[in-house]
Amino acid sequence: MLQTNCPKCKSVIESPYLNELSSVKCGQCQEVVTVENVFVATRGFTIHREDLNNRISRYEKLLREVEAERTMMANDKTVSEKTSQSFDQFCLTLHELLEGARSHFRLKMTRELYLQMDSDHNKSKVKLIDISTGGASIECEMLDNLPRPKAMITLQMTLPKFHEPISALAKVVWVRRLTEESDAELYRIGVKFVNLDENAHTSLWSLITEGSVESSSFRAS
């Protein structure tokens, strides 16, 4: 969770969206104040967001090492349950810290929601994994035209409460294969939105802040 202190009453203001807001209303004194000095707070650990970003590569490396150690522990019957639980909590804390370092809040989908991806003049149906005003993660089976990193694609989506479909130009940042044993080849694709227009930004921000995932009626346009 992201936190900042109200300059008026000194109370703690919490919001997962602080990194995208220039001002926020304090729940204690009801004053609208400027967002400054944002902290990332996890269970038992708090760090200034700027300090975290300055050391982000170290925390990413630490997470990889802890996850590797946890994997080895899973195959070691001499490791106590308490130790395993502690490492699980440590991994969770590091994940929360890295999530707080992001420039945009990511809304993770809790149901299967599909979009249309236009890539190199081909249209494909893809599943939305998470989304922010900065980009998204999508999932699809192996395609003849599977986009590569740096490729430009267009995502077509229809959001609840908005009559017109949104068309978002995006650049592929990474592509990862998810399955090894299964017959179906599943891939996850991370994209960054390019020149998102004001209407699209407003629509996505509304979806994210309202958290209306369960009642959403996403569909491919």
Q: Where in this protein do the model-derived segments appear?
A:
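N-terminal helix initiation/capping motif
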Residues: 1-141, 206-221
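Short, solvent-exposed secondary-structure boundary/capping segments
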Residues: 137-140, 178-192
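Short coil-to-beta transition motif at edge beta-strands of beta-rich domains
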Residues: 109-114, 146-158
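Well-ordered alpha/beta subsegment
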Residues: 195, 201-208
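Short coil-to-beta-strand transition motifs
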Residues: 107-108, 121-123, 159-169
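Short, conserved beta-turn/loop elements at beta-strand boundaries and strand-helix junctions
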Residues: 118, 133, 175-181
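A residue-level detector for short acidic-glycine micro-motifs
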Residues: 130, 172-174, 195
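Small-residue-enriched segments and motifs
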Residues: 113, 126, 170-173, 191
